[in-house]
């Protein structure tokens, strides 16, 4: 298998990823700003399928209408020249100080109304550029202290905002769905809708739940100590995996945004295995930050590494699934039984079945090993290149 990416792999990057200048709470930028046009050109050369953007990534905050149109025109020309697409867009409701207490859930009503108008304006541009998904990350929607935010009221305002955006998209006839991106904390001390499970539950309360799904990010779920492939599996099970952000994270700490494959490599293996076998057809979107130690050569090497690592893991996962010994081990671990209904014969038959309870040999069942360790070692062998 070739590990050279092509547009058919559907790899995408945010302008803010390779464009991150390395500025953090403890240090200034280590790289100059990157022109979005150059980003499009370089990512196309690397084999990417598309780019994504926050409104302020493409059009600097405070630009005049004339300046705005100029930025859009240059960006569109770069897309046309390279064949790159814009599958997703989003709104920056976190950088400007006006959003210090959030956008959709700010206590200040005027700020909430401004946040909605800013979002609607970029939805128009997203639709114009052909985006099919609109991500919403509420990085400032939260609090640091208990009395600062009535969470029930804040969730009401969050629901109101998404319902209004759904109403707008429907009225305009846009072929666009929303993907909520959970995160437990950072930059706020505690962020609303902190995990995939919280977001899935919230979506069911919206007026048009069919328009809303999730955009889970590797590092965000792992910051909460959760199993990312399990969260993705539940989102797929619910039919709500509308988008995904791929990166690397090493345990419960700040949001590292490492290139994909760095950090928890085992989780990355199982994630790719899941995406490639579960029928996920969306972009494989990288939301990472090249370390501030790197110059631009390092930036592009990091971006290329994201795609290469995904393709290597895809190859390893396919070899794992095709291995006859693995298939035998899967049966020994009774995965085929898990796929069978527990009581397809119905409740009455279950209650009448003495073998299910009265005559069930609990001790014999308890003594049966599950053979999980052998199966897991086969996975490790494939991941580490010792098999296949």
UniProtKB/Swiss-Prot annotation:
<feature type="binding site">
    <location>
        <position position="217"/>
    </location>
    <ligand>
        <name>Mg(2+) 1</name>
    </ligand>
</feature>
<feature type="binding site">
    <location>
        <position position="255"/>
    </location>
    <ligand>
        <name>Mg(2+) 2</name>
    </ligand>
</feature>
<comment type="subunit">
    <text>Homotetramer.</text>
</comment>
<protein>
    <recommendedName>
        <fullName>Xylose isomerase</fullName>
        <ecNumber>5.3.1.5</ecNumber>
    </recommendedName>
</protein>
<feature type="binding site">
    <location>
        <position position="257"/>
    </location>
    <ligand>
        <name>Mg(2+) 2</name>
    </ligand>
</feature>
<dbReference type="InterPro" id="IPR013022">
    <property type="entry name" value="Xyl_isomerase-like_TIM-brl"/>
</dbReference>
<feature type="binding site">
    <location>
        <position position="217"/>
    </location>
    <ligand>
        <name>Mg(2+) 2</name>
    </ligand>
</feature>
<dbReference type="Pfam" id="PF01261">
    <property type="entry name" value="AP_endonuc_2"/>
</dbReference>
<feature type="binding site">
    <location>
        <position position="181"/>
    </location>
    <ligand>
        <name>Mg(2+) 1</name>
    </ligand>
</feature>
<keyword id="KW-0119">Carbohydrate metabolism</keyword>
<keyword id="KW-0413">Isomerase</keyword>
<comment type="function">
    <text>Involved in D-xylose catabolism.</text>
</comment>
<keyword id="KW-0859">Xylose metabolism</keyword>
<dbReference type="InterPro" id="IPR001998">
    <property type="entry name" value="Xylose_isomerase"/>
</dbReference>
<dbReference type="InterPro" id="IPR013453">
    <property type="entry name" value="XylA_actinobac"/>
</dbReference>
<feature type="active site">
    <location>
        <position position="54"/>
    </location>
</feature>
<dbReference type="InterPro" id="IPR036237">
    <property type="entry name" value="Xyl_isomerase-like_sf"/>
</dbReference>
<keyword id="KW-0963">Cytoplasm</keyword>
<comment type="similarity">
    <text>Belongs to the xylose isomerase family.</text>
</comment>
<feature type="binding site">
    <location>
        <position position="220"/>
    </location>
    <ligand>
        <name>Mg(2+) 2</name>
    </ligand>
</feature>
<dbReference type="GO" id="GO:0042732">
    <property type="term" value="P:D-xylose metabolic process"/>
</dbReference>
<feature type="binding site">
    <location>
        <position position="245"/>
    </location>
    <ligand>
        <name>Mg(2+) 1</name>
    </ligand>
</feature>
<keyword id="KW-0479">Metal-binding</keyword>
<dbReference type="GO" id="GO:0005737">
    <property type="term" value="C:cytoplasm"/>
</dbReference>
<feature type="active site">
    <location>
        <position position="57"/>
    </location>
</feature>
<dbReference type="GO" id="GO:0000287">
    <property type="term" value="F:magnesium ion binding"/>
</dbReference>
<feature type="binding site">
    <location>
        <position position="287"/>
    </location>
    <ligand>
        <name>Mg(2+) 1</name>
    </ligand>
</feature>
<dbReference type="GO" id="GO:0009045">
    <property type="term" value="F:xylose isomerase activity"/>
</dbReference>
<keyword id="KW-0460">Magnesium</keyword>
């Amino acid at each position: 298998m070739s590990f050279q990416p092509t547009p058919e792999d559907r790899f995408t990057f945010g302008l803010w990823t390779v464009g991150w200048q390395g500025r953090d709470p403890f240090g200034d930028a280590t790289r100059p700003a990157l022109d979005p046009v150059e980003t499009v050109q370089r990512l196309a050369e690397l084999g990417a399928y598309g780019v994504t953007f926050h409104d302020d990534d493409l059009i600097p905050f405070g630009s005049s209408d004339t300046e705005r149109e100029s930025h859009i025109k240059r960006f569109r020309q770069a897309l046309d020249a390279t064949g790159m697409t814009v599958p997703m867009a989003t709104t920056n409701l976190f950088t400007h100080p006006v959003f210090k207490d959030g956008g959709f859930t700010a206590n200040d009503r005027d700020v909430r109304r401004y946040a909605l108008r800013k979002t609607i304006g970029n939805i128009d541009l997203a639709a114009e550029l052909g985006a099919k998904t609109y991500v919403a990350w509420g990085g400032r929607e939260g609090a640091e202290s208990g009395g600062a935010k009535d969470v029930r009221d804040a969730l009401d305002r969050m629901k109101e905002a998404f319902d209004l955006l759904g109403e707008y998209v429907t009225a305009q006839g846009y072929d666009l769905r929303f993907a909520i991106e959970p995160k437990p904390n950072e930059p706020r001390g505690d962020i609303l809708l902190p995990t995939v499970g919280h977001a899935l539950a919230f979506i069911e309360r919206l007026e048009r739940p069919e328009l809303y799904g999730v955009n889970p990010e590797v590092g965000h779920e792992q910051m909460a100590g959760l199993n990312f492939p399990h969260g993705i599996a539940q989102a797929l099970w619910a039919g709500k995996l509308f988008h995904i952000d791929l990166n690397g994270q090493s345990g419960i700490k700040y949001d590292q945004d490492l290139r994909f494959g760095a950090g928890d490599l085992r989780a990355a293996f199982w994630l790719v295995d899941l995406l490639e076998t579960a029928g996920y057809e969306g972009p494989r979107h990288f939301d990472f930050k090249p370390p501030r130690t790197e110059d631009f050569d390092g930036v592009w090497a990091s971006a290329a590494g994201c795609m290469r690592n995904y393709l290597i893991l895809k190859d390893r996962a396919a070899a794992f699934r095709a291995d006859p010994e693995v298939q035998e081990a899967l049966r020994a671990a009774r995965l085929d039984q898990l796929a069978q209904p527990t009581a397809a014969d119905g409740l009455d038959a279950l209650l009448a079945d003495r073998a299910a309870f009265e005559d069930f040999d609990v001790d014999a069942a308890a003594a049966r090993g599950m053979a999980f360790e052998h199966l897991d070692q086969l996975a490790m062998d494939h991941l580490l290149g010792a098999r296949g």
